[in-house]
Amino acid sequence: MPKPAVIVVGADKGGVGKTTVSRTLLDYFSANNVPTRAFDTEFPRGTLKRFHPDITEIVDMTTTADQMKIFDTLNSAAPSVTVIDVRAGLLSPALASLRDIGFLDAAQSGQITFAVFHILGPSIASLDEIAETASFMHGAKYFLVKNFINNTSFFEWDQATYKTYFHRIKDATELTIPKLNEMAFEQVEVSSVPFLKFVANKGHHDEPANYSFVLRGYVRHWLANVWSEFDRIQLTDIVGKERSGPRPTVSGAGIGAPPEK
């Protein structure tokens, strides 16, 4: 049985697109045939669950009972990969809880694979978040994600200052999520389907849909760029997936032909 892998996606600031990143991760693992389950900590409504209802459970990560739902089942759950979409403002408290229950020690000793995707905003406050999370990163794969999905400009950052923060965490890796065409992003939001199903022109239950050919093309191109970042960091290798055959591509899902006039 493969070693459990836990991926935490979060930020202490809201509005930086962390759930968007979680959605791209779930699509990526699905395309790579990596069984995955997800926990949406946007309690009680949830956001991630709207797009991936079959594999996502809404939890309140501030309660011990719901922490047990996630971590007591790591070795018994059929999917070996767990993605946790952490509510805005909860990243530092969540990492503190992982320390207190001994999870970080288990990761450091190699019993569990642990990765953190820290979604950064454009302000200096995001750099302070890096300093706050640094003490929790022993034994973790730490990814600093610049997410341009909201047309963010990282203009407030002095590069020398950023590098000072960046180097506080050993082996930290930077990722870039490019901007997606706004109309395409909005249409996927309205459709409430995974990006991959939107590209393939399918509904939640794989029924044929009638999404715009143009917008699907924008999403396909954008998702391919995101996945190339995940390929670059060898994400499937990190979670212990043995590769057989070539890496799947977004175009493999097919966008179909343009609609007939």
Feature map (PLM): residue ranges:
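C-terminal accessory "lid"/substrate-recognition subdomains
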Residues: 143-261
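A generic secondary-structure signal
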Residues: 28, 73, 132-136
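Nucleotide-state-sensitive switch-loop elements of NTP-binding domains
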Residues: 2-8, 31-97, 111
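Catalytic cores of phosphodiester-bond-cleaving enzymes
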Residues: 1, 125-130, 137, 214, ...
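Walker A (P-loop) phosphate-binding motif
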Residues: 1-29
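Conserved phosphate-coordination/catalytic loops
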Residues: 20, 61-65, 124
